[in-house]
Amino acid sequence: MKTLTMKNLYRALVLTTCGIIITACSPENPTSKDDFEKQVEDYIQKFPYQNTYEYAILFTGGDPGKLNKWGQASRDLLKAGEDTIVRSNNDTLYKTAFIYLGDGPVVLRSDAPSQERFSSFQLQDERNANYRNIIGPAGSYTLYHGEKPGTVTGEAVEVPSLLSAVVTRIEVKDKDDAADMAGAQAVFDGIKIEGPTISEMPVVDLLSDFDEQVAQEAHRRMDELAGVVPFSRMIVGPGQEPGKDVPYLYHSAGTKEGWGGPATAHSAYEAMFTDESGATLKGSKGEYVVVTEAPPVKAFWSITVYDSTTGRLHPNDDDRYHINNTTAVKNEDGSSTFRFKLKCEDGDVNCLEVPAGPFDVVARYYLPEPEIMNGKWEMPHPAKVKND
C-alpha cells in the first residue's frame, strides 16, 4: 500500500508563494503590505484543496474505510438538515463518494440507465476542478491515477489526482408522482461503485498556519466576488486550469459558494442574492416575484431557495424547496410566475417559502443551450411586490 502523504496527494505542480505544494508550508506572519498580499493570494489558491479535503472528512467521518464507497446515497430528495454540501441540489437524487486511487483503480457502473431522464457522473479532482462529466452514463468506467491498469472494465478514465470526488445526479421530475420517483430510483439503484479498501486516511493541512487577518481578508474577497460574478464563471471545467483559464479568486469563491459545482456544459447555475434594484433579498421585506419564460435547455431546469446565512435549504412544512419545468404552473403566454414569501398560503401558485433574513435563489439549467452559456439569456432577478 502507498503511504497517504502530502507528497502523494499533491503531485500536480501548483505554484504558490511557498513553491510546489508537496507538504503544508508554514507561512510566517506578514511583515509588510507586500507580504500580506502574497499570503492572501496564497491562502486563496490553497483554499479549494483544503475545502475538498474537509468535505472528504465530512462524508467519511474521517474513516478511511469509507473511501471508495458512497458517502451520500439517499433514494429521496434531500430535505433541510440533510444537505451536507452548501447549496445542495434538491432537484435530483444524489450519490456522492470520495475515492483514493493509491491502492488501485475504482470502477463505477450504471446498470439501469434511462433515456427519459437526465443523469450524470461528475468527476472532480482534489482542487474541486471538474476533469470529466459523463452525461447519461451507461455501463462501466474504470477510474485510475498514474499508470493505466492492465485490466480495465468498460471505459478507462484517467484521474489527475489520487484523491477525487464522484458526484452522481438523477433527475426527479415530480417528487409527488410515485411512478416518476420509482423511475428515478431504478436508475439510482443501478449505479454502483467498487474499489479497494483504504486503511489510512490522507492528512491535508494547508491553511491552519495562516495569520487570522490573512484568512479573514481572503474570505472577504471570496464572499465579495461571489455576490457579483455569475456562478458559472467560477467553475473549472474539463480541460481548464485554475489560474490559467479561471482566476484563482474566482475558483476559490465558487468553491466556497457551492463546492461540487459542475461544468457549464453539464449544467449552468445562476445564483441571485439581490432583487432587480440590487438590494439584498430578505424575507422580512415582504413578497418577491420572478416572471420568466422557459429557460433554453436540452434537459430540464429548476429554481431553488436557500438561506444565505447558512447556504442551506430553509425548512418548511411541505419540504418544498424547488420548482422545476415539470411542476411549474404556466401563465397563458407560456411564462411562469414564481413567488417567494415567508409563508405560502392555500391557493398560492409556484410559491417557495423563504427565511426572514437574507435568502438567495439559484436557477439550474441542465444541458443549457448556447444562449445561456454565452450569457445572452438570464433569468430576471426577483422583484419586490409593492403593497397597495
Spell out what each predicted region is.
Residues 2-14:
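Bacterial N-terminal signal peptides that target proteins for export
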Residues 14-15, 326:
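Short linear sequence elements within intrinsically disordered, low-complexity coil regions
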Residues 21-24:
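C-terminal motif of bacterial Sec signal peptides marking the signal peptidase cleavage site
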Residues 27-388:
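A compositional/structural signature for long, glycine/proline-rich flexible linkers
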